[in-house]
């Protein structure tokens, strides 16, 4: 690479032709490369893209430092090919209903702490649902078509909120930070960041990092993999503030369980080494244009299965 601090990503290389076809089919070409691109009709896609590629795609260049987050590391670990589609090619995906329900519940739990402590009841949380759902619909109108039974949708979100109140009593503490963005250049060319659902600082200075999950807790033996996300957040907070968080807490609203961990400096130093290793592997994948697919049961939930080389020999 000409500049070690930046990575040039060949977005429209020969290896990406199937991805380009996919993007064109769903009408995203103008959004990707700008207004100078002529409208491309559905059908005979490859012929039209070949005619336009010299004048259009030669103008596209992407140079940026590598952005890492816990979710990006997880995507690359699970399937480098999926990571490429999402993080390198930035192919669009339709919203996930499970993820959107999670967003709604997260929003309510964030806004709950705007209410004075005595008023943070399950009833007040559920009362927030309709207005927050309306705001979510305004931001993403496609959800109107996806959610066919709005009452059932809101009832399921309310059930998750009710579970939260069996696990914590929000009237007994103040959330110091909500949706807190942590970031750090932990290497000259690697930008590490993440969003913490809630970070509590006790009057005595101890720090608790909390993440809400609307799914179910991991099976016994899989807790460490789930805690990786919070250890990255703890590492960032430690590097930025010089304070080692006292407690990491995953709150699973799907089955009413909590996974806790008291991080140590050794664990966070090990987490940092893991991040360096993944960053190195991703740089190699970018340089060599090598993104192996990892077929697994997760493929059935992957939106890109129809264009994935592992399923289209």
Regions found by a protein language model. Name each.
Residues 97, 101, 105, 153, ...:
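Hydrophobic (often cysteine-bearing) scaffold residues that line and stabilize catalytic clefts
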Residues 174-180, 192-196, 295:
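Short beta-strand or tight-loop elements
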Residues 2-102:
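C-terminal, charged and often intrinsically disordered regions of DNA end-processing helicases
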Residues 108-180, 185:
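A non-catalytic, helix-rich entry segment at domain boundaries
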């Amino acid at each position: 690479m000409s500049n070690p601090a930046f990575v040039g990503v060949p977005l429209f290389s020969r290896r990406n032709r199937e991805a380009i076809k996919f993007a064109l089919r769903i009408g995203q070409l103008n959004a990707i490369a700008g207004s100078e691109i002529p409208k491309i009709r559905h059908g005979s896609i490859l012929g039209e893209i070949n005619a336009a590629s010299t004048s259009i795609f030669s103008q596209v260049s992407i140079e940026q430092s590598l952005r890492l987050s816990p979710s990006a590391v997880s995507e690359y670990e699970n399937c480098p090919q999926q990571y490429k589609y999402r993080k390198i090619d930035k192919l669009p995906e339709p919203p996930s209903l499970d993820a959107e329900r999670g967003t709604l519940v997260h929003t309510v739990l964030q806004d709950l702490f705007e209410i004075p402590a005595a008023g943070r009841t399950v009833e007040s949380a559920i009362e927030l649902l309709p207005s927050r759902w309306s705001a979510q619909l305004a931001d993403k109108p496609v959800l109107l078509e996806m959610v066919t039974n709005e009452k059932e949708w809101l009832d399921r979100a309310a059930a998750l909120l009710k579970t939260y109140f069996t696990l914590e009593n929000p009237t007994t503490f103040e959330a110091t930070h909500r949706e807190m963005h942590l970031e750090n250049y932990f290497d000259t060319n690697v930008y590490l960041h993440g969003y913490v659902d809630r970070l509590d600082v006790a009057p005595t200075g101890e720090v608790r990092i909390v993440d809400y999950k609307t799914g179910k807790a991991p099976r016994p033996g899989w807790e460490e993999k789930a805690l990786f996300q919070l250890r990255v957040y703890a590492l960032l907070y430690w590097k930025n503030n010089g304070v080692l968080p006292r407690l990491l807490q995953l709150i699973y609203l799907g089955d009413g369980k909590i996974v806790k961990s008291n991080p140590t400096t050794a664990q966070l130093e090990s987490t940092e080494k893991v991040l360096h290793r993944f960053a190195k592997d991703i740089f190699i994948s970018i340089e060599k244009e090598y993104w192996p697919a990892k077929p697994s049961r997760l493929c059935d939930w992957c939106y890109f299965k129809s264009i994935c080389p592992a399923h289209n020999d």
